[in-house]
């Protein structure tokens, strides 16, 4: 089951579904609307209200700060913000970073029991920035989170893999001129084709690789391949992701 993300116009969910259907010729690939809208639409009005309240609280609790996970309960206004975002498929929390594993657990509860099985792969496209901690506890932005459901972040494809080294060198050298000047200098120092940016037409092709990794993970428990030319390669740099 592939769930569309209407907030990302340059992400072609139909093309991605066709790719998965060709890759997994033994399986049925179903393209569905946005994940939350799909599952909320199958609940009664009272059930929807309760589900939205639970989800909004979960998203608010999963929001990460500069130091990592929050240490205090979410403010009512933060929960209301998440409620509004959940009920409007066109809204987006751009710039906010969430604990990906906490989000995954919250979304899992929406899936009907009959589809919460090993026979079903749920692949959720999202525009939210998701992160997981490294062994030292430092959170890193991710493109893909493999679990149940699997999550693919369009924003994560832009922000997760590191940009070319020239980008960071130019940014460091120009930082004394101010943050904006540093960003402009960094982007100007690198060929635009060397990294993925917002609105990039290459996003769908990039996410095909991560979708293939999700399938591999679901079938074998191992999503990656050591071959740099393989779609299953675990890219840490933008240039590896776009290879």
Model features per residue range: what roles?
Residues 1-2, 20, 29, 152:
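Hydrophobic beta-strand residues in large extracellular and virion-surface proteins
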Residues 1-10, 37, 123:
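Short hydrophobic beta-strand segments
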Residues 7-11, 131-134:
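Short, surface-exposed beta-strand/loop "edge" segments at domain boundaries and coil↔beta transitions
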Residues 9-30:
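Zn2+-dependent metallopeptidase catalytic core
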Residues 30-38, 226-230:
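Acidic carboxylate-rich catalytic motifs and surrounding loops in phosphoryl-/glycosyl-chemistry enzymes
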Residues 37-224, 234:
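Metzincin-family zinc-dependent endopeptidase catalytic domain
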């Amino acid at each position: 089951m592939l769930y569309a993300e209407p907030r990302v116009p340059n992400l072609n969910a139909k093309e991605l579904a066709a790719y998965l259907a060709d890759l997994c010729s033994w399986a049925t690939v179903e393209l569905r609307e946005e994940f939350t809208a799909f599952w909320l639409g199958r609940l009664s009005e009272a059930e929807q209200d309760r589900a939205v309240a639970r989800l909004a609280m979960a998203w608010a609790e999963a929001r990460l700060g500069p130091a990592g996970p929050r240490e205090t309960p979410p403010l009512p206004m933060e929960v209301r913000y998440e409620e509004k975002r959940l009920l409007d498929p066109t809204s987006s929390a751009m710039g906010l970073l969430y604990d990906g594993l906490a989000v995954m657990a919250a979304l899992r509860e929406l899936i009907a029991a009959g589809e919460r099985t090993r026979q079903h792969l749920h692949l959720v496209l999202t525009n939210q920035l998701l992160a997981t901690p490294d062994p030292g506890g430092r959170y890193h932005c991710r493109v893909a989170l493999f679990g149940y459901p699997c999550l693919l972040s369009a924003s994560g494809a832009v922000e997760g893999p590191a940009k070319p080294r020239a980008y960071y060198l130019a940014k460091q050298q120009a930082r004394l001129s101010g943050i904006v000047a540093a960003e402009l200098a960094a982007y100007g120092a690198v060929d635009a084709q060397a990294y993925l940016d917002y609105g990039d037409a290459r996003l769908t092709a990039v996410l095909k690789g991560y979708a293939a990794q999700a399938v591999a993970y679901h079938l074998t428990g191992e999503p990656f391949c050591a071959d740099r030319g393989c779609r299953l390669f675990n890219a840490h740099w933008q240039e590896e992701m776009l290879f």
